[in-house]
Amino acid sequence: MKTKNILAAFTLLAASLCPTMAQAQSDEAKMNTFIDNLMNKMTLKEKLGQLNLPVTGDIVTGQAKSSDVASKIKRGEVGGLFNLKGVEKIKEVQKIAVEQSRLHIPLLFGMDVIHGYETVFPIPFSLSCSWDMEAIKRTAQIAAQECSADGINWTFSPMLDICRDPRWGRMAEGSGEDPYLGSCIAKAMVEGYQGQNLAAPNTVMACVKHFALYGGAEAGRDYNTVDMSHWRMFNYYMPPYKAAVDAGALSVMTSFNVVDGVPATGNKWLLTDVLRKMWGFKGMVVTDYTAIQEMTAHGLGDLQQVSAMALNAGTDMDMVADGFLGTIEKSINEGKVTMETVNTACRRILEAKYKLGIFDDPYKYCNVKRAKKEIYTPQNRAFSREIAAKTFVLLKNEGNLLPLQRKGKIALIGPLADNSKNMSGTWSVVARLDDNKTILGSMKKALEGKAEVLYAKGSNLMYDAKREADATMFGREMRDSRSKEEMLKEALDVAQQADIIVAAVGESSEMSGECSSRTNLEMPDAQKDLLIALKKTGKPIVLVNFSGRATVMTWEQENFPAILNVWFGGCESGDAICDVLFGDKVPSGKLTATMPKSVGQIPLYYNHLNTGRPLKEGKWFSKFTSNYLDIDNDPLYPFGYGLSYTTFKYGKPTLSSNTMTNNETISVSVDITNTGNYDADEIAQMYIRDLAASVSRPVKELKGFERISIKKGETKTVTFTITPEDLKFYNQELEYKNEPGEFEVMVGPNSKDVQTLTFTLK
């Protein structure tokens, strides 16, 4: 009888699923019929036009410019356009495509909506430090809502490049050094952008970038060579890309770098064998800015040769270079490209347009009333303020100097204390820069009638004016014409009057980001001298540090009692920073990249291999072990680290079982008690180590985390489930599997301060 009930239930479940499956098959059949009919009418030039993605001059994100765009649209020689700002402008251009081209095919409209649209959220690296997947997903939803209201239907995000070298400026755009956390964020971002229904007017097509391995650039120098084994790339660099594909991302952008000596844009193994055959990706592949043209500089031939190579490799859309539009017809005539290859690429782009619903309604993203109502709303800005406070990482708080009291005189000093243009961070291309909240403005508001705020800029970003100009693209100039002596005197006069100093220093927004690699990750020279002078006053100093990457703060750690890393917090930065400084919010962010003591330690990451001659953690030099003569191996701050205004005590973890098989899971539980004086959030972390395997395995790997709210005096139990999947890795033959044997599971507040248990996989 029980068996009959189970069978009956299964039959009912299958029946309930059948309409959904049938509907999906019916929808796909309709799409295929529609596209077949359309492509039967298209000329070769019109098909190549769908593969063409020129740029407008509204927003500058690269060197090359497109020409004669309107005429090309009329001739059906453009598939999409990017960097056009404003719903009315976009509607005008869409009208040209729909009403003046022969086949009336609507355009895609793309933009780098990286961390918000006009409502700007913290930079992606900062967001990752919140470890809050629902909040991160919500930022993507709001970004999609705003940009789609302004005519955009395609965002070149999320950026999923794992980075172990903070000299690389584009660490700011990613989620740090860990593939597990990066994969969780990839899923959240794609789901946030695309939603449950890509044809809805408030969702946009996501674009996974930069595929692949861009974050592995040698020496951290942007656009530089990448060279790594397949074993390393599949274990550490590929997982976030795959997670985004699994989450349904409909487009992928190629990276500038080589993979196995072949530029990614022309790499058939990467774009066809891995992305499509191994991972099952069905969407469209677009190049990065002029990436096809740049293959000539890589030494792969002239524009015709590299264009054919890219198309044959699996690239579908050419951004800016005009290589496909201008050369592929000749390559077809010469037998170097087949018509089938062109048709396949064209179909993928038309499928994306169909799924977005713009064949049904080309103007669905062009509602002017919606743009006025849904962009930069008070609700969206309030959420930006809320999530920003969750991303800040408290690195040091000696003597509980923070939170500050609302009394007395506070000296706010530094080049980033009152500069709205640098609050939103890199790649905030349509931000309302002048409306961004500054620390000075927000602090005056927070302390009105309670305490006095004294302000001085103190210094420029750096002494060298040209180098400062190089680091302030997108018009974010902040240089003061006064002499360094004049600015320093003003700062010291202000400091002497105050009870406490808040120093707002660090990187400007464009000192990190694209083409912003640095060899020296310490505080810029002018600001370092300012801090030295302020320290000599003897006043207590809170360091508020801005950066788009992990920086070297060894001197600051040794010399200042309190350090709050605020990264770049978006349009509401000033309010969010003051929320944390004055205790309205309790800092809860934790590092997603290891912070080194010296740039000479880089690359430095927590999930490293042990080597045959490891130096024990916390030890200095030991002959014939893997170490340095002049510094220990340990980071300044480990991965996962971050303090709070309260304190948390971890109990002893327990395992549900000491053994598991590939058909079951086990769990590890730990009690966490808030032993301090503030209700606060804690981010508990679980790491796994495979003690004996067929290849060398990392000393630990993140495999679980939970952000949990705990009231003061309260104890909560956090339970992590360990699955067979958590124990899998790519072996030397690139087989993804786990192996029987002994494992360690570690639980704690960061990657260093953990408690360890062992279990066996049978």
Locate each region found by the language model.
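Glycoside hydrolase catalytic-domain context in secreted enzymes
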Residues: 22-728, 737-751, 760-762
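Bacterial Sec-dependent N-terminal signal peptides
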Residues: 1-26
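Acidic surface patches and DE-rich sequence motifs
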Residues: 731
